[in-house]
Curated annotation (Swiss-Prot):
PANTHER family: SPERMATOGENESIS ASSOCIATED 6-LIKE PROTEIN, SPERMATOGENESIS-ASSOCIATED PROTEIN 6 SPATA6. The keyword Phosphoprotein applies. The modification Phosphoserine is found at residues 260, 263. Belongs to the SPATA6 family. The gene is SPATA6L. This is Spermatogenesis associated 6-like protein. Residues 286-301 have a biased composition (Low complexity). Residues 286-305 are annotated as: Disordered. Pfam families: SPATA6. One of its GO terms (cellular component) is sperm head-tail coupling apparatus.
Length: 392
């Protein structure tokens, strides 16, 4: 089993009374022990030199089996020849201090000891030296300590978290506060404002708030103008989907988008579609009371584009019924809505006389459908029985 020798050398001072060195350069002490060479730091050349340093030497003797064999190996030291030279002359032997060619072989004669038999041996070798710039580690450490000293010290004892964790937490909190329809997008200022305009009804969430996926208004008003007065790129599918889900609850923002006829001018297209909920109502007429239909008809406004501002006031006292409790088409034209039809009639007439309507007189489809809206009767419609289905 190999043995390891560990030597710890402590150097306290070097004294030489009455001696003054002619040179004023710094001096150091070098120790060579067990094939290892260590040096001390540099000190001023004035005796006594107080060093106060320690050196550690380690060596493994693989062939030793006991400490006595190690002692014998330490005594086996016979110096035959040596060569001593300063580092400058050893690396740059030329007078002009120019490095020798890397492939050029150098030859130096060694000095023999007293017991060496024969002439001095000669060493053949070559050296290659490079001087390059490097980073001074002590200087960087000084700059880092100086930079850390300028930082303000925190007096709070709370745990410190990284900055990205706080943002993620804020993002997660913001996403939890918003509806599910907006969580797929980044919570930027523009996206939040865009969501408020598209789906204003989902912002005021109550305890009994429910979104029925089967709700479908009988009339769909689409914006077919290519000029896009609001300057927003809105697809037809997204516009139709947002109007299906809009129920205009107590919305605090004065949003007036395509739900107002002031922005549509003469480019209004009315598409008549049957109400699928009438079929469900006719099948379940035996278990539902007609008095419930009258209560819900005054509060529900199917077409958000034709009922604009009136829907904000009428939906305040309404609840969220199921798919079977949706109002019938004929109940939407209750005698109480006569004033609404008058307002629509006056607004459409003002749209036709506007400058925008005169620019689009060449569009036959838009003109014919607007005339169809004007010629519709403003008198209240009759109440039909539950089993009748009528489409307007």
């Amino acid at each position: 089993m190999p043995l390891e020798v560990v030597v710890e050398l402590q150097i306290r001072a070097i004294s030489c009374p009455g001696v003054f060195l002619p040179g004023k350069q710094d001096v150091y002490l070098g120790v060579y022990l067990m094939n290892q060479y260590l040096e001390t730091n540099s000190f001023p050349s004035a005796f006594p030199i107080m060093i106060q340093e320690s050196m550690r030497f380690e060596k493994v003797f693989e062939s030793a089996v006991d400490p006595g064999a190690v002692v014998d190996l330490l005594e086996m030291w016979d110096e035959l020849a040596y060569y001593e030279e300063n580092t400058r002359d050893f690396l740059f032997p030329e007078p002009k201090l120019t490095p020798s060619h890397p492939r050029r072989c150098r030859e130096v004669l060694m000095k023999t000891a007293l017991g060496f038999p024969g002439i001095a041996p000669k060493i053949e070798f070559s050296t290659r030296t490079a001087i390059r710039e490097c980073v001074f580690l002590h200087r960087n450490r000084f700059l880092e300590e100086r930079h850390e000293s300028r930082r303000p010290l925190s007096t709070s004892h709370e745990p410190i978290f990284p900055l990205n964790t706080i943002k993620m937490k804020l993002k997660e909190n913001n996403l939890n506060r918003l509806p599910k329809g907006m969580q797929a997008r980044a919570p930027s200022q523009y996206s939040t404002r865009h969501f408020f305009q598209d789906q204003p009804a989902q912002l005021n969430l109550g305890n009994n708030f429910k979104i029925s996926g089967g709700s479908k208004p009988p009339f769909v008003v689409r914006h077919v103008d290519s000029a896009k007065p609001f300057g927003e790129n809105i697809s037809e599918h997204h516009l139709r989907r947002s109007r299906r889900k809009s129920k205009f609850s107590d919305f605090p923002f004065p949003t007036r988008r395509a739900s107002s006829l002031d922005s549509l001018a003469a480019n209004v297209k009315v598409i008549k579609e049957p109400d699928e909920r009438i079929v469900l109502r006719s099948d379940s007429s035996s278990c539902l009371d007609s008095s419930q239909f009258g209560k819900s008809s005054s509060s529900k406004q199917g077409d958000a584009d034709f009922h604009g501002k009136a829907s904000f006031a009428t939906y305040q006292h309404s609840t969220s019924p199921g798919p079977l409790d949706q109002p019938l088409l004929r109940e939407r034209f209750h005698p109480g809505s006569q004033s609404t039809w008058k307002n629509i009639h006056e607004r459409v007439c003002s749209l036709l006389t506007s400058h925008r309507a005169q620019l689009h007189q060449n569009k036959e489809d838009s003109t014919s459908e607007v005339n169809y809206i004007i010629e519709r009767p403003s008198y209240p419609l009759k109440k039909y029985s539950l089993h009748e289905q009528r489409y307007f």
